[in-house]
């Protein structure tokens, strides 16, 4: 996918990985970058606008846990303004296993609902033009961090959802791939809380391992966007971008 002159919606585009990715996207010259985030950050929006004045940056407050109808209403506002949208990035996520329901609601249900909502505008069965979705999942979708089983399970669910959608592209016209960062130095990682406090030092222990910066992750994220491979399972770890080959242990036969 060519980012230049495209219209992009970025859910959670002002977070740690999100903000650096927004910066890299803006450098590539899209026509519009629409940032949806729960927390307003005027300074970050101003920075993005200054980074490339030719790009129109728009912000809308958005919590992915709102009812599906509210998400559809917001997307209608965006589509009415832009007419077309080329790429949706689902990037909302929390890393706190003490908040079980919210972890599932943000990391999994929010991705499902935002994706479902945009199908009203993209699904070729309804006369839509199709589109591209990049879902930010996690390497914990491959192998869990067992001290944070809720977070790991939510990301595994998001990854499974994404791989299923990719196989529906011939029906919907919407292509999908997953972005799976490894341990990345963000504020969220420092606030990582384990399930039932089974490991009080989980954040500290994770950061003892080799990590990557948010900039390294963002630069590889943009490479994945440009590659635009339906069904790709991208691992973004230690400053590398690698396509993962998923091992099939069972087949539904349908």
Swiss-Prot record:
The keyword NAD applies. One of its GO terms (molecular function) is alcohol dehydrogenase (NAD+) activity. One of its GO terms (biological process) is alcohol metabolic process. Its EC number is 1.1.1.1. NAD(+) binds at residues 10-33. Substrate binds at residue 138. It is an enzyme of class 1 (oxidoreductase). Gene3D superfamilies: NAD(P)-binding Rossmann-like Domain (3.40.50.720). Keywords: NAD, Oxidoreductase. One of its GO terms (cellular component) is cytoplasm. The active site is at residue 151. It catalyses: a primary alcohol + NAD(+) = an aldehyde + NADH + H(+); a secondary alcohol + NAD(+) = a ketone + NADH + H(+). PANTHER family: 15-HYDROXYPROSTAGLANDIN DEHYDROGENASE [NAD(+)] (PTHR44229), ALCOHOL DEHYDROGENASE-RELATED (PTHR44229:SF8). Homodimer. This is Alcohol dehydrogenase. It comes from Drosophila silvestris.
């Amino acid at each position: 996918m060519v980012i230049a002159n495209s219209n992009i919606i970025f859910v959670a585009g002002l977070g740690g990985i999100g903000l650096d990715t927004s910066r890299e996207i803006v450098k590539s010259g899209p026509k519009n970058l629409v940032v949806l985030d729960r927390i307003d950050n005027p300074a970050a929006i101003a920075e993005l606008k200054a980074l490339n004045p030719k790009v129109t940056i728009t912000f809308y407050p958005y919590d992915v846990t709102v009812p599906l109808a509210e998400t559809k209403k917001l997307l209608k506002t965006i589509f009415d303004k832009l007419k077309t949208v080329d790429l949706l990035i689902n990037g909302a996520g929390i890393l706190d296993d003490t908040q079980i329901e919210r972890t599932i609601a943000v990391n999994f249900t929010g991705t499902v609902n935002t994706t479902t909502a945009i199908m009203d505008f993209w699904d070729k069965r309804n006369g839509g033009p199709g589109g591209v979705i990049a879902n930010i999942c996690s390497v914990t979708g491959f192998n869990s961090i067992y001290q944070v089983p809720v977070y790991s399970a939510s990301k595994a669910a998001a990854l499974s959802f994404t791989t299923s959608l990719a196989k529906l592209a011939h029906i919907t016209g919407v292509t999908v791939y997953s972005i799976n960062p490894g341990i990345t130095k963000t504020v969220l990682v420092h606030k990582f809380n384990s399930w039932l406090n089974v490991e009080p030092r989980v954040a500290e222990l994770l950061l003892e391992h080799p990590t990557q910066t948010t900039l390294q992750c963002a630069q590889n994220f943009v490479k994945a966007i440009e590659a635009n491979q339906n069904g790709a399972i991208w691992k973004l770890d230690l400053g590398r971008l690698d396509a993962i080959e998923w091992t099939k242990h069972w087949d539904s036969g349908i």
